[in-house]
Design a protein with these regions (language model features):
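Short beta-strand-to-loop junctions in surface cap/lid or active-site-entrance loops
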Residues: 93-98
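Conserved redox-active cysteine motifs that mediate thiol-disulfide chemistry
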Residues: 99, 107-124
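Hydrophobic beta-strand anchors of alpha/beta hydrolase catalytic cores
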Residues: 104-105, 135, 180
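Short alpha-helical
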Residues: 113, 142-145, 167, 197
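Conserved segment of the thioredoxin-like fold in thiol-based oxidoreductases
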Residues: 117-120, 124-164, 177
Length: 219
């Protein structure tokens, strides 16, 4: 049973890689998000824990899932590895800690043109919706010192995580920069978008998420 499960998971990831190879995504202007938009509605977000960008905590992302038997993602070969949402390390960010309210995740990297500047947009919207919506900015595979300097120079106060080896970006099918995931409370995907957004456009996505959350809770 485990062998068959491993084969299915392997084929799924291979399919995502093939699609990513055949589709070139350019920054800005929107378009389809590889991976995220191909997933079904209410897709449960994979658990992960990463170092906070400005912290002194070092290491790669922890993507060990809580339940290896029912997870749609492979678990680490080391069965003793602590699941991401069970770690308690100073300077770490766990995605599950954001699941108590609607959540926006921004995936980005400095090689993606103006992606760093797009986080200024996220910061402004974060300030507008602070308390009612969670925000997580996740830098993928950049130099850590460069990230720390960006946080300092831009004055970001929103949570900023660091995905050093790109494990989280791979799990989430990030195919362009910036990629945004809009998430229901509890950690299931509501929608996704790719490309640069204005404050008004990102706020529009947040409002749509809030309305969808209200409808879901009323049903």
């Amino acid at each position: 049973m485990r062998d068959r499960y491993s084969i299915v998971v392997g084929l799924l990831f291979l399919a995502i890689i093939v699609v990513a190879t055949l589709n070139t995504i350019e920054g800005g202007g929107g378009g389809e998000t590889l991976g995220l938009e191909q997933l079904p509605a209410r897709w449960p977000l994979p658990e992960f824990a990463v170092p906070a960008g400005a912290s002194q905590l070092e290491g790669d992302a922890n993507v060990a899932q809580d339940d290896c038997e029912t997870s749609s993602l492979p678990c680490p070969e080391d069965s003793q590895r602590t699941p991401a949402c069970r770690i308690h390390l100073a300077g770490s960010i766990r995605v599950c800690d954001f699941f108590d309210k609607p959540l926006v995740i921004s995936f980005w990297f400095t090689k993606g043109g103006g992606c760093a500047d797009q986080q200024d947009v996220v910061q402004q919207v974060f300030e507008r919706y602070r308390g009612s919506v969670g925000f997580l900015s996740l830098d993928i595979r950049d130099d850590r010192d460069t990230l720390r300097e960006s946080i300092r120079q831009h004055g970001w106060t929103m949570p900023v995580g660091y995905d050093r080896d790109g494990a989280v970006g791979s799990l989430y099918g990030v195919g362009g920069c910036p990629t945004f995931a809009y998430v229901y409370p509890g950690g299931t995907l509501q929608s996704a978008s790719i490309g640069d957004l204005t404050v008004a456009q990102l706020s529009g996505h947040v409002e749509a998420l809030l309305k969808a959350t209200t409808r879901a809770e009323a049903s």
